Amino acid sequence: EQITVSLSGIGSFVPEITSSLGHSGYLRKDELRELKEEGVCGDLMIRFFNKDGKECNTSLKNRTMAIEYDQYQKIPNKIVAASGVHKAQAIVSAINGRLIDTLIVDSLLAQQLLDLAKTT
């Protein structure tokens, strides 16, 4: 409750392509399957969220040492930095869930986000 600024990256959950948690071996195949079944599309500080930016209730939730999801949401200035077009959907979902206040991206990702905005 005393945190006023957060700076983080954002994880994109497309396990067969980009999930660094999967490629690094941090998550087992059964855990990746569970995340997919729960509709996870991204994570902030290893707190997983769905397409609406709502926290997903997974078996990993209670085993993760990170700020609680509701505490993170209360931070007044949540800054997220990202690069790579594969992060676009996770960013849109996080914005929908009010998980990002300030966004820093590369030019290709910025263009992808603009293109997504035009189709909605």
Residue ranges of predicted features:
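Conserved phosphate- and dinucleotide-binding cores of soluble alpha/beta proteins
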Residues: 1-120
